[in-house]
Each structure stands twice: as C-alpha cells, then as structure tokens.
Amino acid sequence: MMQTKVQNKKRQVAFFILLMLWGEVGSESIQYSVLEETESGTFVANLTKDLGLRVGELASRGARVVFKGNRQHLQFDPQTHDLLLNEKLDREELCGSTELCVLPFQVLLENPLQFFQASLRVRDINDHAPEFPAREMLLKISEITMPGKIFPLKMAHDLDTGSNGLQRYTISSNPHFHVLTRNRSEGRKFPELVLDKPLDREEQPQLRLTLIALDGGSPPRSGTSEIQIQVLDINDNVPEFAEELYEAQVPENNPLGSLVITVSARDLDAGSFGKVSYALFQVDDVNQPFEINAITGEIRLRKALDFEEIQSYDLDVEATDGGGLSGKCSLLVRVLDVNDNAPELTMSFFISPIPENLPEIIVAVFSVSDADSGHNQQVICSIENNLPFLLRPTVENFYTLVTEGALDRESRAEYNITITVTDLGTPRLKTQQSITVQVSDVNDNAPAFTQTSYTLFVRENNSPALHIGSVSATDRDSGINAQVTYSLLPPQDPHLPLASLVSINADNGHLFALRSLDYEALQAFEFRVGATDRGSPALSSEALVRVLVLDANDNSPFVLYPLQNGSAPCTELVPRAAEPGYLVTKVVAVDGDSGQNAWLSYQLLKATELGLFGVWAHNGEVRTARLLSERDAAKHRLVVLVKDNGEPPRSATATLHVLLVDGFSQPYLPLPEAAPAPAQADLLTVYLVVALASVSSLFLFSVLLFVAVRLCRRSRAASVGRCSVPEGPFPEHLVDVNGTGTLSQSYQYKVCLTGGSETNEFKFLKPIMPNFPPQGTEREMEETPTSRNSFPFS
C-alpha cells in the first residue's frame, strides 16, 4: 500500500521534475539559422561535428529530429549525417508578426536514449511590400483649419519584420501638407498628415495626394494609397472623445454580438455640426472581429476570437460631426485566454514488443503541448497506478515511458496503457492516448514435468517396441522457448543396459520397451528422463521413471523331490502296519514365477490302486488313505500332478514308487548309481543331489557307530530314509535278522524342501528308533505316523 502511494506521488509530481533526471541532456542549445523561402534540401548543418559524436554513431543510434507539433521542418540524412531543409519555410506563416522566429527542436538518439536541444532561426527576407487597407482615403478639412493641425491616416501593414518591415511614410509633393511617421507602443508605425498652409475652399475645393509606405529592404518595397481631401466650410468644433485611449478585456469565448466597450465623443457645435457619428479605422475590414454602432458608439463582437491566434487588437475609433470634422481615439482590446484547448500528445518513439527480463526499458517517447496560456497551458501526464511502468520528463515537455522493473511475460503478456494528459485550467481538459505494449518471451522458465516421478507397469514377455507409458513436461515460455525435447539420461547404475531396454520419443515423451522383458531376470528398474527446451541458452529438468515388470505365468512348476530321473526312480518303503494318514513322502516343487502364478497345488493323478494313497493339495504330502492289508500289492506307482495358479495354469508331474513291506530291521539298501544328469538339467538339482548324497553318507556313518556302541547287537547297519532303490523285486540281501519274517526296526529319514527355500541347505533330524518288545509280533510293533513328517527339508 505504501509503495503504491509513493509511486502515485511520483507520477503526480513528474511534470515538475527538471532535466536533472537526464544527465546526458545538454544544458546548452545548439542554434542554427536559415533564410525563409530557402529551397527544400538545402544544407543546414552537420550533426556529427556539432554534437561531437563519432562517425557513424548517429546512424547506428537511429538519430531523428523532432519538432513541436510533430512537424518536420528538417530532415536527417543518415548517409552524410547532415541536417537538410525538409520544406520551404515561410516566416510569416510560422511566426506571424513576431520579429524573432525561432523553432525549437530536439535531436533524439537511442541506445542509450539521449536528447540534444537545438533551435532553428528563420530569418526574414523582404518578400512582402507594405499594403494599405484601402486604395483611397477621404479627409474632410475645414478651410479655417490652422496650420499645424494633425490628421491621422490609416496605417499600412507589412508582413515582414525588422529592417524588412514598414519603416516610414512619404507623401506626394504639395504646398499644403507633409506626413509624419509615428510609432505605436507595440512598435507599429502609422502616418499623420500635418497641415502646413491654410486651405481655401474657393480656390481649391479638393486635393488628391498619394501616400507612400516604404520598408527597409534592399531594394525597398512600397505601397500606396490615394488621399482625397475635401475642403469644407467653417465648422468651429471638432468631436472630442472622453478618453484618448480606451482599454477592454474580452474572454475569447464571448458570444457573437456581445458588447465589448462603448466609446463616447462630444461636439460643442449645434445642429448638424454637433451630431457625431462613429466609425472604426480598420486595417482589414474582412478579418476585423469588431463592429461599432455609428450612433451609440457601442463596439460589439462580430466574429469569434481566438487567443491562440491573436492576443490583442489595437483599433482607432473616429468620431465625425455633421460638418465633416473628426476626432480620434485609440482602443486596445486584450483577448483573455479561456481553457478551450485540450492538451495535445504527439508520439515520437514507440517500441513493441519489449523483452521481459530487462529493467527500465524505454517503451515510448512523446511530447505534450497546450495551445492555451498560463495555468491553462500547464499539463500533468499520468498513467494507471497498477502498471509496472513509469513516466519520466525529459526536455521541453518531452516524456519517456519506461518499465519500472523486469517484466514477466508468463504473468502478463500484454499491457494496455492509457496515457492521460491533463491541463491545470478551469475546467480541466484532458487528452488520452492508449498504446498496447507486447512483452516478448525470454527463456527464463525450465520445462516442468507433471510429476516428479512416474511408475509404469509392463507385463513380461511383451512385444518389442511396445508403448509402455508417457512422460509429459510443460514450459511456461512461448514459441521456440516452450518447445520441449525429451531424452533418456545416463543411468546411475552402470550395469543397467538402459539403451537396450527402453527408448523415448523426443517430441512427445512416449516410452517404448525395446525388447521383451523377463520378470524372472529383471523385476524392476528405474532411470531418469530429461526435458529440454529449445531456448538459448536451453533450460532442462528431469524426472524419475520406475518400471515394474509384472509377472506372467510363463514357468511351469519344477519338481525338486523326488528326483524325476528315469534311470533311477525313487522308491518309498511303507510298512504294511502303517495307520491311515501315514506320511509316505512329500512332493517338493517350486515355480519360477511369483504371486499367484507360483501358488502350487497337488493332486493324485494316477495310482496303481485307487483309494490307497492320497495327496494333500497344499503341501504335497503323500499319505496312506486307509489301513494296508496283505491283499494290497507290494509295489505301487503314483503320479502326482503339481499345478500352479496362473492363467492359464501350468503343471508338472512327479512319479513315485512305493514298496509295501511287512516290517524291516537293519535293512541294507544299496543306493544305485544315478544316471548322469542331462546337459540341460537345472544346476540347482545337481547341487541338491550332491548335497543329499554327502549328508546321507555322513549320517549313515554316525548311525552305524551309534548302533554298534549302544546296542552291540548288530555288526552292520544300513540307513533307510529317503532311500532310492531300483524298481523290481525286493533286494535279496534285506533279510529278517530275528527270523520273524519282518524287519524288527525301521530307520526312516524324511527330507523336506519347502517351496520358498533357495539356500540348498538340508536339515536332518535324529532317526526314529521305536522300542520293540523282545517277543512282539508284527501287530504289536507300532510306528509313530508323524515320524515321517518330522524331518523337514528346507
């Protein structure tokens, strides 16, 4: 608020700030002179020399000559740097009767803005002869008039001034009169006829004389008027005015017919000799704005006055009686100025558009004038307060419109500025001129992304050149400064092959996958994109793009256990005494996909005898479904289907061989040599087999040592766990050491591998060694069902 008041105050007093604001304006005015009526194109001066500038500086700085009222009396030649006359000058038209005719002007330079004051004096030549208002004048003079009597005559008018103006009057040779040349207060010369010798009507009733007006030119010019003198009979008294000089003041806007003043004269004679009539000694009957009532002496306005053209009138009023005698007085009418002229604004220099980022740019240079006078002529310039512009006075009623500070095109690209010029008259008159200033763009805004980071989702196995998303940036600038180009920035991870993964359309920010993505190889990656405008210098910004690869069900389940090796199938041993729900084994499988594509379910697809075994759907455990009997076949082949939850689902099968035994103790089940894995077998499977064999061998040795020390009943023991035996008849070396026909003890080891395990580590629990009674039968020998499930593989 305070800042606005200060700015407003500055603008109000702007008119009264003097030339101190512009140090570069010269304090002395350069003066030139030229004779009037000189031909157009005549050399006046060389500006480069007179202004003390370098050669070529005037042309490079756009020199121009500015006169008041926007008239171009002179022209500047940019080639020679000379000032030349632009037109013939008529001093009388330009300055009227003013003797000293001086036309002020300014030389305006740009970059930086600079003013030089100068003036052109138009010198008078003797191109006008004196002229009388009438070719003939009539005088009536009584024969008894005494010598020395003075008779005023109508004056001649010469448009020239100084020595070329009217200088003197002469009269043709005669014995009765001579002429005197008198000076008025304002400098004009008028003639007076002086009687030298008495007249005699009877001898010569009339005379004709020639009045000659001469100027001071070389050679002199002259004008003539005939004087006809009638000699009258005796009339003793001459009309006499109450005052020798009357003065009146008339506002220029007085209506026609209004009374200016009333003059009055008396004549002491009687009868017709005492009757007075009034008349004006008029220089120009056509242009004279006054008229007089011949009877009353009232002088009234018959034509409109204009103070700006003529400020005062000098009139001679004549009073004539009936006998022909006359008296004379002078009337000075001063025209009073009325504020009837609005100020004028002349634009000399205007720039649009202007750059937005530079302070105090000169937008316009203009001059103001008012044809009135006094307070009516004083003016104040102003613009709206809410605009970032200032008015600064320079010289001779010149103003500059400058920016107050740097503009911002993005906030406002155009300003409509109304310049108001108001005079100080009553009532105040004003003139307004509107200009439109365009603000040109400068690249001062970097592109801005709509988001600081983008997250894109791409399903794996996509087709190359797939459009995976877009980034977008906008620039508040305009034109070429707002044209945005997109690019990929170097990745922060040097191992990320970004150039082979994605590309970006430089024009619209569309992102494309260059090749098919594999979720199992690359789940996500991120990179930065840049947006650069085309300004100078170019500005840029960047945004982060995260690409998340969505899993597709492109991997089938893989069975880790039992190993699916055609040359060495896995055989599980199950005692016939097993209860329903007895854990036979567990199918362990993994899926390379993720999410629901990796959710596995298990089901029994085929079995030698349906209803004997079942598979738990969620964990792949194979358990007995009922009690076993002697009638059940000893060998069983199970096919377990492992299926994921993808769409469409993928599956794999695992084949199990189950051998039903009546009972066993210290069996020796040699491990067959595994067939060499095919070249394309998974490396993880190889590691699992090697680790399993190593751990099993170590564990077997420990069990043998433990049994030999504690029981001392066996000389040799074999570990039966997750054993692999070839299909076919039960090995002959597995014998019943107790002679009961069954195995008295069962050493079972369960290896479980969970689907989430990726460490290839195996964990083993201690073997289950049930305590059998010495004389127990097969029925009395119970095996804990959970023992098969107490040996997890993770």
Curated annotation (Swiss-Prot):
Keywords: Calcium, Cell adhesion, Cell membrane, Disulfide bond, Glycoprotein, Membrane, Metal-binding, Repeat, Signal, Transmembrane, Transmembrane helix. This is Protocadherin beta-6. Residues 1-27 form the signal peptide. It is a single-pass type I membrane protein. Disulfide bonds join C95-C101. The gene is PCDHB6. Residues 28-688 are extracellular. Its main location: membrane. Forms homodimers in trans (molecules expressed by two different cells). Forms promiscuous heterodimers in cis (at the plasma membrane of the same cell) with other protocadherins. Cadherin 1 to cadherin 4 domains mediate homophilic trans-interaction, the interaction with an identical protocadherin expressed by a neighboring cell. This is a head-to-tail interaction, the cadherin 1 domain interacting with the cadherin 4 domain and the cadherin 2 domain interacting the cadherin 3 domain of the other protocadherin. The cadherin 6 domain mediates promiscuous interactions with protocadherins on the same cell membrane. Each cadherin domain binds three calcium ions. One of its GO terms (molecular function) is calcium ion binding. Calcium-dependent cell-adhesion protein involved in cells self-recognition and non-self discrimination. Thereby, it is involved in the establishment and maintenance of specific neuronal connections in the brain. Residues 784-794 have a biased composition (Polar residues). SMART domains: CA. It is found in: Cell membrane. It comes from Pan troglodytes. The chain crosses the membrane at residues 689-709. One of its GO terms (biological process) is nervous system development.
